[in-house]
A protein has these predicted regions:
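Secreted, disulfide-rich extracellular signaling modules
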Residues: 1-262
């Protein structure tokens, strides 16, 4: 048996109805409930990322991963939860005042082309932002500016291009025509339930990655992680619920990766 790791080439957390960019933050925070710097009555975030699959494909072609693309080869996305180290963190407040989320489902979806399964691929940039909130006082002391609205964000993929639908897709299936995409048309790669909210991400990407290796799937520009629409659309909450996972900028051995086992 051989095990191979593929790492992220870029990642970002986009926030509902906001131009903020947090692409260089070491933690991605998925939240829902009362809005954090977004438009009422509810707010939420979605995480997007891409994988550098070139080394994996080259190792398969060279025979280093000898089984090639067979049913025996599996691919699992692994991300470490920032609350997985201390059970005392359950049901407590995070540093921003949000409550650690429990009992929820996350989806892993493929970033769609401009009209769903057709059209042009949506290429996007990671961005240079860090914080959700601008803090000019820190800038005046000579610290690196942590707040940025440079793309990507909820609306933009790059400086001169936008998502075909703000936030990538509509979670209430209200998009029409070829300019947007509904949740019902997304390619859902996997879904994971979190009972306590301190579990690590373990998404099964076996079929998705194998289809890229064989050429069955082309033009992929990455994937996203989000709460299921039923959670994103909850209104009337008076608190914010959140869960955090380490991103590629963690600078620790908790860096996220795709694990290939053959």
């Amino acid at each position: 048996m051989s095990i191979f790791r593929s790492y992220f080439s870029k990642n970002n957390t986009i926030q509902k109805n906001s131009f903020v960019n947090t692409g260089r933050n070491p933690v991605m925070q998925l939240f829902y409930g009362t809005s954090l710097q977004t438009t009422a009555p509810n707010g939420f975030t979605r995480f997007i990322f891409d994988l550098d699959l070139t080394p994996l494909i080259e190792n398969i072609a060279s025979g280093t991963i000898s089984t090639g693309c067979t049913s025996a080869m599996t691919h699992t996305l692994k991300m470490t939860n920032t609350s997985s180290f201390d059970i005392d963190l359950l049901n407590t407040e995070a540093s921003d005042g949000s409550i650690r989320a429990t009992s929820f489902d996350l989806i892993l979806f493929r970033i769609p082309k401009t009209s769903g399964s057709t059209g042009n691929s949506q290429t996007w940039d990671e961005g240079v932002g860090y914080d959700y909130v601008d803090t000019p006082a820190l800038d005046s002391w000579g610290f690196n500016k942590a707040f940025s609205t440079r793309p990507s964000n909820w609306y933009q993929t790059t400086t001169i291009t936008n998502w075909s639908y703000p936030g990538i897709y509509s979670n209430n299936n209200t998009s029409s025509g070829n300019t947007g995409l509904n949740y019902s048309a997304l390619t859902i790669v996997d879904t994971q339930h979190f009972e306590f909210g301190n579990e690590d991400i373990n998404f099964d990407m076996t079929h998705e990655i194998n289809s890229i290796i064989t050429g069955s799937t082309t033009g992929s520009t990455g994937w996203g992680i989000a709460y299921v629409p039923q959670i994103e659309n909850i209104t009337g909450l008076t608190v914010t619920y959140s869960v955090g996972f380490f991103t590629r900028h963690t600078q620790t051995f908790y860096q996220p990766f795709l694990q290939t086992t053959a």
